[in-house]
Structure formats: C-alpha cells, structure tokens
Amino acid sequence: MVPDAKHAPLPCPCGRPAYDRCCGRHVGTALPAPDAETLMRSRYSAFVLDRREHLLATWHASTRPAAIEPPPPGLRWLGLEVRQHRLTGPDAAEVEFVARSKLAGRAHRLHERSRFVRDQGRWFYLDGEIDPPVAG
C-alpha cells in the first residue's frame, strides 16, 4: 500500500527518515540530543530550515556568537554526509561531516571536524576545523 502523500512524513534535512521523528524532536524543543552526532544533525537541519535560535541554543556559551547572520538569498542545502563520530573524552566528542550546498548556480562542499562538549548533561557545539571550501 502506498502512503497518502498528504499524510506522508516530511523527510529530515539531515538525510534520515521523517523530520518529526528525527531532528524535529530537537529543533525548537527542549528535548536535548542524546549524543554529539544527533546534535550535529539537528544543527544541520536548523541551517537548512533557517532556525537560528536552535543554532544559538546549542552553541556552548564559551564560544557562542551574539547573533548568526541570515543565510544568503537563494542558498540551498543539498545534503549531509556524516563521516565520523567519536568520543574524545567522557564529555567530549568530534563529528566529521560534509555538507553540500548550492548558491547562485554554484555547488559548494563544507568539510568540517566539529568539537562538542557535554555540559550539565546536555551536548553543545564548541567549535570546528573547516577544510578550505571546495566549489564545483
């Protein structure tokens, strides 16, 4: 049986199944992500959906900017590939990922190794190392 398109769940921007059962459980809610990879996926979804409040709320206070600029007009996020997720300590983790986007007809890849910390039981984005951008 084919699901009714009107009631089919929206796909999650992070590439996993339904948004409401994936990143939608964390973006704009008080439910903390259970691990750094889940938090990183929810942050990617927040970038796709322009939910800057989630990005700020999940950024560690020690490195959080005062504000996040809106995305450039016409930016389209095309996909996320998580390459590695590893614990680096009892309350620290790294997630390596590639996020693809398109702007003004040009494709771009963002390759980052992000660092996360668990503070008072919640995971937060700390910072990341970004490889030089690749266009094309």
Swiss-Prot record:
InterPro entries: NTF2-like_dom_sf, UPF0225, YchJ-like_M. It comes from the Bacteria. Belongs to the UPF0225 family. HAMAP family: UPF0225. This is UPF0225 protein Mpe_A2093.
